[in-house]
């Protein structure tokens, strides 16, 4: 008898792990690492104006079947369903991210979806879609930040703070992160706020009370956050295309972890240990073709079929044979 649900088998196949029972923190960490190698943090459906209402079935279709990536509300939700099927005590909550470029303002209020794990009466944050700020292990939720998790990308901790106000939302904890000591940029080694959240706030999900998954609730938390991204006055994720993922690149027979980042007009590899960058700028008259080539070759994502307007705005010599083909 197969001990796994159809969804678990599908999820294991997508993250390229052999099916096994997930019951310990080490087991969960293996899943988080596998997710980081497969799931791309990207906003391409929003940029292409092809977004859908995000029910459980739609998320499965987009990310597991069609092998797309997505923002936090997609990857973290699929992880939630996967762990829930193993009987783990997990729920989702909504957070507010601090702007990761300036650290001078909050991003979209209540616009980040994370997972909270209650394991042996201790709470942990699990997040596989905070851009490429990935702990790759559950991060213990503590009052003083004394338990630090270190991954190849950086260090992570959770601290309790009294009455954190982010816009109109009030939270109780913050997740902080910094780069490793080997990083060449000194300022990046300072702790900064990633996001604020309340681990006891539970977000109910589509299909949670419906074993047959015939729920047609289109107003899910995931759909709500997606709409917040689209309507964001700061336009952090709704105008410029972005795809980023942790990758392993081989250099002189040594495996090095890098963050691959694809934008409208460039592709960048950032060394996780040192922060050193290798950047390739695209030819302005060939942006869309080069963008799609990198989606396929680096991120293993399907190419864009509809040309977003922002690409057309960048060049007057756009190849006719590429138009919305």
Swiss-Prot record:
SUPFAM superfamilies: Cysteine proteinases
Swiss-Prot/TrEMBL keywords: Acyltransferase, Transferase
Reaction(s) catalysed by this chain's protein: an arylamine + acetyl-CoA = an N-acetylarylamine + CoA
EC number from the UniProt entry: 2.3.1.5
InterPro entries named among the record's database cross-references: Arylamine_N-AcTrfase, Arylamine_NAT_domain_sf, Papain-like_cys_pep_sf
Entry's Gene Ontology molecular function annotations: arylamine N-acetyltransferase activity
Domain of life, source organism: Eukaryota
Catalytic residues of the enzyme: 72, 112, 127
Pfam families per UniProt: Acetyltransf_2
Family listed: Belongs to the arylamine N-acetyltransferase family.
PANTHER family in the cross-refs: ARYLAMINE N-ACETYLTRANSFERASE 1-RELATED (PTHR11786:SF9), N-HYDROXYARYLAMINE O-ACETYLTRANSFERASE (PTHR11786)
Protein name from the UniProt record: Probable arylamine N-acetyltransferase 1
Organism encoding this protein: Dictyostelium discoideum
């Amino acid at each position: 008898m197969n001990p796994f649900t159809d969804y678990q088998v599908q999820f294991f196949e997508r993250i390229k792990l052999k099916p096994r029972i997930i019951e310990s923190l080490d087991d969960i960490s293996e899943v988080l690492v596998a997710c980081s190698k497969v799931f791309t943090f990207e906003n391409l459906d929003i940029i292409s104006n092809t977004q859908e209402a995000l029910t459980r079935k739609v998320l499965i279709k987009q990310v597991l079947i069609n092998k797309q990536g997505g923002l936090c509300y997609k990857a973290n939700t699929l992880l939630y369903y996967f762990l829930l099927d193993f009987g783990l005590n997990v729920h989702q909550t909504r957070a507010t991210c601090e702007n990761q470029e300036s650290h001078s303002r909050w991003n979209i209020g209540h616009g980040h979806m994370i997972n909270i794990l209650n394991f042996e009466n201790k709470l942990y944050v699990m997040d596989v879609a905070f851009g490429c700020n990935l702990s790759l292990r559950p991060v213990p939720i503590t009052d003083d930040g004394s338990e630090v998790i270190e991954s190849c990308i950086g260090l992570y901790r959770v601290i309790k703070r009294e009455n954190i106000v982010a816009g109109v939302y009030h939270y109780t904890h913050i997740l902080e992160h910094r780069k490793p000591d080997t990083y060449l940029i000194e300022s990046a080694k300072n702790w900064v706020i990633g996001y604020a959240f309340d681990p006891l706030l539970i977000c109910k999900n589509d299909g949670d009370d419906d074993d047959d998954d015939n729920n047609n609730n289109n107003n899910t938390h995931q759909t709500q956050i997606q709409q917040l991204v689209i309507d964001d006055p700061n336009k952090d994720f709704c105008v410029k295309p972005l795809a980023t993922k942790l990758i392993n690149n081989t250099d002189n027979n040594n495996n090095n972890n890098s963050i691959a980042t694809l934008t409208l007009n460039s592709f960048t590899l950032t060394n996780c240990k040192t922060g050193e960058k290798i950047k390739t700028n695209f030819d302005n008259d060939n942006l869309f073709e080069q963008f799609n080539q990198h989606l396929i070759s680096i991120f293993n994502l399907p190419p864009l079929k509809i040309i977003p307007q922002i690409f057309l705005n960048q060049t007057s010599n756009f190849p006719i044979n590429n138009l919305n083909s």
